[in-house]
Amino acid sequence: MTPKIDILIFGAHPDDIELGCGGTILSEIENGKTVGLVDLTAGELGTRGSAEKRKQETDKASKILGVDFRLNLGMKDGFIKNDENSQYEIIKLIRKYQPDIIICNAPDDRHIDHAEASKLVVSASFLSGLVKIRTEIDNNIQNRWRPKNVYHYIPVSYTHLTLPTIC
């Protein structure tokens, strides 16, 4: 049986999670929380680097952060869709790991994959709690599960605040 985790974090691409909430991950792990990461794509369309290089970087980052696991769903970079098939993939993971908290990309990000990934994860988080949606893994029917909270991260590089601005 898969152990329940406290926080499940989704990113459209490898590196989205670290850039968007790496500090939060470290803090939560230091506070004893269990954390799993899920990249939706391999980032194969990225301008800088390659899917292979990003895989190496995410493996290293995951080890440094001390997360419990990291998965890649292999969705097509640039073409993430909030459709039924994609929702079922996410629902199965939510039901498998039963997180209390889910964190994902910001819904209004200008990058189409980030915005669509956010909508996908939010939709699946709701649907995972519906008893009439049936899912199974390895021929075992999954129980419904809805996380208590869904939060969004915004990479700090997207903000233009300085200390005097916020004080």
What are these model-predicted stretches?
Residues 68, 100, 148, 160:
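Conserved acidic residues
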Residues 112-126:
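Short Gly/Thr/Asp-enriched flexible loops that form oxyanion-binding sites at enzyme active sites
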Residues 67, 93-108, 117:
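Proline-aspartate-enriched helix->loop->beta-strand connector
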Residues 145, 154-158:
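Phosphate-binding/catalytic loops
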Residues 1-97:
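Active-site rim/loop-helix segments in enzyme catalytic domains that contact anionic ligands
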Residues 33, 145-148:
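A short helix->loop->beta-strand "cap" motif at the edges of active sites that frequently abuts
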Residues 160-167:
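Single conserved hydrophobic/aromatic residue that forms the stacking wall/gate
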